[in-house]
C-alpha cells in the first residue's frame, strides 16, 4: 500500500493520528513516514479551512490579481487564461475556480483598482475651487495620464471584452464605482473650465478613449514592428506624454 493510498484512506475514513490499525501493513520506518504524511495532510486541510475565511479569501484574491497583472504586463491579453494564471500562482485550476470563474472577473477587479487610482489622482491634483489656467490643466492632466498608462491598457479591453463576460451583479458594482468617480471629476472639471457638466463629462471621456487607444498602439506590437520592417515602413515616433499634452490642449480649447 502506497503513502498516497494511505492518505486517501485517512481522507475517506478519518484515520487521523492513530495508525495502530495499519501497523500490520507498514514497518516502523514506513509508519513514521506515513504519520508525517498524515500530519502534512491535516495541516493542509487546516490551511484550506482558513482559506474560506473572509480575510484569507481577500488574501488569495490579491494573489490572483497580482499574478494576473504581472502576466498582462508582459503577455497579450489573448494568451492569458485561467490555466496560465493558475500556473503563475503554482495552483491547480480547481483551486483557482474556488475564487473566480472567468479571467474577465479578475481583470474587472484590477481595472477597478487602477481606475480609482487614476481618478483619485485627478481629484487630488485639481482641488476644489482651484483657478488653474488651461495650460496648467493640460500639463498636469497629461502627466497623470502618462503615469497611469497601465490603467489605459485595461480601459482598451473593458467595453469590448472584459465587461461582456462577467455577471451583471459584478458589472453593476464596477459601474457604480466608475460613475461615482467619473461624476466627481466631471463636476470638478466643469467648475474649472466654466462649462456644463455634460461638456465636461464628454471631455474626460474623449481623453480616456484617446489615451487608451495610444496605450495599445499597434506600433508597440513586436509582430507589427516586424511586418513593417519587411515592407520598409518606418512608423512615426511615439511620445505618449507629448501626444496627450497636444490632444488635451486641443480638446480643452474646444469645450463644446
Regions found by a protein language model. Name each.
Residues 10, 15, 23-45, 183-187, ...:
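C-terminal peripheral helix-coil segments that are non-catalytic and often amphipathic
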Residues 19, 30-75, 83-84, 129:
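Basic, helix-initiating cap at the start of DNA-binding domains
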Residues 63, 71, 78-105, 109:
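Helix-turn-helix
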Residues 109, 124-151, 203-207:
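Hydrophobic alpha-helical connector segments
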Residues 112-119:
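Short, basic, alpha-helical segments at the C-terminal edge of helix-turn-helix-like DNA-binding modules
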Residues 147-169, 222-226:
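Amphipathic alpha-helical segments used for helix-helix packing
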Residues 165-193:
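Amphipathic alpha-helical packing segments from all-alpha helical-bundle domains
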Residues 191-208:
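All-alpha amphipathic helical-bundle segments outside canonical DNA-binding/catalytic cores
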Amino acid at each position: 500500500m502506497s503513502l498516497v493510498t494511505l492518505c486517501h484512506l485517512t481522507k475517506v475514513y478519518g484515520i487521523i493520528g492513530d495508525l495502530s490499525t495499519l501497523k500490520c501493513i507498514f514497518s516502523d520506518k514506513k509508519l513514521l513516514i506515513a504519520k508525517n504524511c498524515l500530519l502534512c495532510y491535516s495541516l493542509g486541510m487546516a490551511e484550506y479551512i482558513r482559506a474560506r475565511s473572509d480575510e484569507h479569501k481577500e488574501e488569495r484574491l490579491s494573489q490572483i490579481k497580482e499574478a494576473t497583472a504581472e502576466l498582462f504586463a508582459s503577455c497579450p491579453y489573448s494568451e492569458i487564461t485561467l490555466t496560465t494564471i493558475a500556473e503563475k500562482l503554482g495552483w491547480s485550476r480547481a483551486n483557482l475556480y474556488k475564487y473566480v470563474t472567468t479571467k474577465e472577473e479578475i481583470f474587472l477587479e484590477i481595472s477597478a483598482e487602477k481606475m480609482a487610482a487614476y481618478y483619485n489622482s485627478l481629484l487630488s491634483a485639481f482641488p476644489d475651487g482651484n483657478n488653474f489656467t488651461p495650460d496648467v490643466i493640460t500639463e498636469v492632466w497629461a502627466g497623470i495620464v502618462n503615469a497611469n498608462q497601465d490603467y489605459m491598457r485595461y480601459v482598451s479591453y473593458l467595453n469590448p471584452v472584459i465587461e461582456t463576460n462577467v455577471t451583471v451583479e459584478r458589472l453593476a458594482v464596477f459601474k457604480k464605482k466608475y460613475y461615482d468617480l467619473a461624476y466627481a471629476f466631471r463636476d470638478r472639471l466643469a467648475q474649472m473650465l466654466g462649462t456644463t457638466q455634460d461638456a465636461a463629462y464628454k471631455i474626460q471621456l474623449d481623453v480616456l478613449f484617446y489615451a487608451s487607444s495610444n496605450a495599445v498602439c499597434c506600433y508597440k506590437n513586436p509582430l507589427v514592428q516586424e511586418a513593417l520592417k519587411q515592407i520598409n515602413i518606418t512608423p512615426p515616433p511615439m511620445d505618449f506624454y507629448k501626444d496627450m499634452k497636444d490632444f488635451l490642449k486641443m480638446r480643452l480649447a474646444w469645450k463644446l
